[in-house]
Amino acid sequence: MRGSLAIYNALKDSNIDFICSVPCANLKNLLKLIEEDKNIINIPATREEEAFGICAGAYLAGKKTAILMQNSGIGNSINAIASLYKTFQIPTLLIISHRGDLKEQIPAQIPMGRWIEKLLDVCEIPTYKPKTPEEAYKLIKYASSYMYKISYPVALLFDALYWEYDLEK
């Protein structure tokens, strides 16, 4: 569970205190760690654009927010990003499981997997792709500060190889 633990520790050390999550198989270990933490509010969402709305409200109420999701949800959330986050300069950290790329078993995930980086670029969301738990920890710490400097979301995109760190004994 080394990959998920690195993300969790970085979120904790960055004082992220409010998370909205949309279930994904790759995020299951991370979600379990977060759900066991009484100092982090985790609101499960049914769709990613719902998570963007919930986190916008939490930010306006003084919370330091993150959204945990898979990449297909960016396609569902472009209007919320453009009309809410861009217009009102709302920072949030995006922890994104990159589906539809390496090792993908579900054909329907592949188109969005190929387009995700371009979509994030069109949305002007800075995106980082950690390859190791150590790099993930450092980049999350950096990104959680940077999002406030730019008053906008910052994304971390985790591919299938990253989640293999959770399989290590």
Swiss-Prot record:
What class does this enzyme belong to in the EC scheme? lyase
Enumerate the catalysed reactions: 3-sulfopyruvate + H(+) = sulfoacetaldehyde + CO2
Q: What GO MF annotations does this protein's record show?
A: sulfopyruvate decarboxylase activity; thiamine pyrophosphate binding
**UniProt-listed Pfam families:** TPP_enzyme_N
What Enzyme Commission number(s) appear in the record?
A: 4.1.1.79
Q: Which family does it belong to?
A: Belongs to the ComD family.
Name the UniProt record assigns to this protein: Sulfopyruvate decarboxylase subunit alpha
Lineage per the UniProt record: Archaea, Methanobacteriati, Methanobacteriota, Methanomada group, Methanococci
Q: Which gene encodes it?
A: comD
